[in-house]
UniProtKB/Swiss-Prot annotation:
Keyword Thylakoid: no
Comp. bias intervals (Polar residues): 31-40
Disulfide bonds: none
UniProt note on tissues of expression: Expressed in roots. Barely detected in flowers.
GO BP terms: defense response
Region (Disordered): 27-52
Induction remark: Up-regulated by the GmPep890 peptide and methyl salicylate. No induction by methyl jasmonate.
Gene source species: Glycine max (Soybean)
Annotated keywords: Plant defense
Compositional bias of kind Basic and acidic residues: 42-52
Protein name: Protein PROPEP890
KW Cell wall biogenesis/degradation (keyword) present: no
Amino acid sequence: MVSCFDFFLSLNFGKMAKRFVWRTDKPQADLPQTPNSQVRIVSRDLPRGGNY
């Protein structure tokens, strides 16, 4: 019974992880369409590039 419960939990976690990845991937794909987010990406990446 415990193994069935663990299997169910792992299935639920897989679904949640898939949904989370899909949620995070979609906005990133939509980002270049809006100029504001593009500027934000550049400003966010500049310090990282300076550190390297």
